[in-house]
């Protein structure tokens, strides 16, 4: 029987030595996944790319989390692993399960639905946290509205003993929202995005875009601080809304820059359906170990039940193509006037959110709805927060937003 050597380079990367080329090729093919829209991309049209994303190099390099697939191929090819060299730093991760009263006498802040009450984790939040503690490298699908920020804060607190934690979120709004929860819980937290670059903190919250920019600037010597220096001492990486990060960028950060972090957890409301996107997350973080659906949260009374009322309008004009019809839908004055009147009537029953996909339509509606706020790309973070706080604290407010 043929044999090979497995070298575990760090927390995510592995390398095989002594494997025949044909076996390496079979493993490479087993870990290649099609990109559905590849045929529209220039590289594919020019014949420079086969339209697939691979997770095992012909040189023998791959990922720890793909070892199941790799060993299956080796078994079928009659190859055994005769030697394993593990170069990972030895870290004794030992966590005890937590209970709902983890935060003791700490209370929810002003503006929270449970303002002034003691912070008590919900049963499903305790379940998610304990699942993570039993699996130091894993992903869980947790629906939006489940309270992921308090879950993240709890995980950061628990892992303080092992070093710094880095929380990666998809946008600036989530940075400040997560920061508020960390501050309320009494954690030593800083943020890194835009013009706010707070260093030397136990816990750092940032966007994946900020890390990517810092990485590029470091390579070209354009930044005083290198990404390696920024990430020094990080032992825990928590990625919120994993599916919103660009697969390749996130994979590079987690498998190269953060390759030695022993604790890596991912939270997402939606597990990517495309295999190549999921495998990038799987390789970087770990397997999916749990799921809390929106339906479960509705059944528990955590999320509101949805009641959909369709307002059918009579549109008589005929349009020759989609773009022409879309232009009519968002710019026709009669139609927009009707929507404005409808919104003014609806807002009497409570706070109202109007989503638009054209700035021009949002501006027209803002003019038609008194005291409404329009949140779009150029609205500063502080102004966005004020708009969100008004919704939290008041009634009959209208927020118009692009999506």
Regions inferred by a protein language model and the residue ranges of each:
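Conserved helicase ATPase core of P-loop NTP-dependent helicases/translocases
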Residues: 176, 188-200, 216, 353-355, ...
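Conserved interdomain hinge at the start of the Helicase C-terminal
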Residues: 155-156, 318-357, 361-368
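N-terminal accessory nucleic-acid engagement/regulatory domains that precede
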Residues: 1-89
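Conserved helix/coil segment N-terminal to the catalytic DExD/H
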Residues: 194-236, 247-256
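Conserved nucleic-acid-binding Ia/Ib motif block in the N-terminal RecA-like helicase ATPase lobe
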Residues: 160-217, 374
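Walker A/P-loop
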Residues: 120, 134-159
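Post-DEXD/H (motif II) to motif III coupling segment of the RecA-like Helicase ATP-binding lobe
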Residues: 70, 235-236, 241-307
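Conserved pre-motif I regulatory segment
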Residues: 48-55, 82, 86-141
């Amino acid at each position: 029987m043929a044999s090979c050597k497995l070298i575990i380079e760090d927390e995510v990367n592995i390398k095989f030595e002594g494997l025949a080329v044909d076996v390496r090729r079979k493993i490479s093919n087993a870990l290649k996944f099609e990109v559905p829209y590849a045929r529209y991309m220039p590289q594919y049209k020019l014949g420079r790319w086969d339209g697939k994303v691979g997770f095992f190099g012909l040189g023998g390099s791959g990922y720890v989390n793909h070892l199941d697939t790799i060993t299956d191929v080796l078994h079928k090819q009659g190859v055994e692993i005769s030697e394993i060299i593990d170069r990972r730093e030895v870290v004794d991760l030992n966590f005890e399960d937590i209970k709902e009263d983890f935060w003791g006498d700490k209370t929810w802040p002003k503006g929270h639905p449970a303002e002034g009450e003691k912070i008590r984790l919900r049963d499903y939040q305790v379940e998610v946290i304990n699942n993570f503690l039993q699996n130091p490298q894993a992903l869980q699908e947790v629906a939006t509205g489940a309270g992921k920020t308090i879950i993240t804060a709890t995980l950061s607190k628990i892992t303080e003993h092992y070093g710094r934690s880095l929380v990666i979120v998809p946008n600036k709004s989530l940075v400040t929202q997560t920061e508020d929860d960390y501050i309320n819980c009494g954690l030593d937290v800083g943020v890194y995005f835009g013009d706010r670059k707070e260093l030397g903190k136990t816990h750092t919250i940032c966007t994946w875009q900020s890390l990517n920019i810092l990485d590029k600037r470091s390579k070209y010597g354009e930044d005083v601080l290198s990404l390696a220096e920024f990430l020094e001492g990080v032992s825990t990486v928590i990625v919120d809304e994993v599916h919103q990060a660009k697969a390749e960028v996130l994979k590079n950060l987690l498998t190269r820059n953060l390759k030695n972090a022993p604790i890596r957890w991912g939270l997402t409301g939606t597990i990517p359906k495309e295999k190549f996107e999921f495998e990038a997350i799987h390789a970087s973080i770990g397997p999916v170990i749990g799921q809390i659906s929106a339906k479960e949260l509705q059944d528990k009374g955590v999320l509101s039940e949805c009641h959909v009322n369709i307002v059918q309008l009579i549109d008589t004009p005929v349009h020759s193509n989609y773009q022409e019809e879309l232009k009519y839908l968002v710019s026709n004055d009669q139609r927009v006037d009707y929507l404005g009147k409808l919104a003014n009537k609806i807002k009497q029953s409570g706070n109202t959110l109007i989503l638009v996909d054209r700035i021009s339509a949002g501006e027209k509606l803002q003019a038609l709805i008194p005291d409404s706020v329009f949140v779009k790309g150029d609205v500063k973070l502080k102004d966005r927060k004020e708009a969100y706080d008004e919704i939290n604290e008041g009634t009959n407010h209208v927020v118009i937003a692009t999506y």
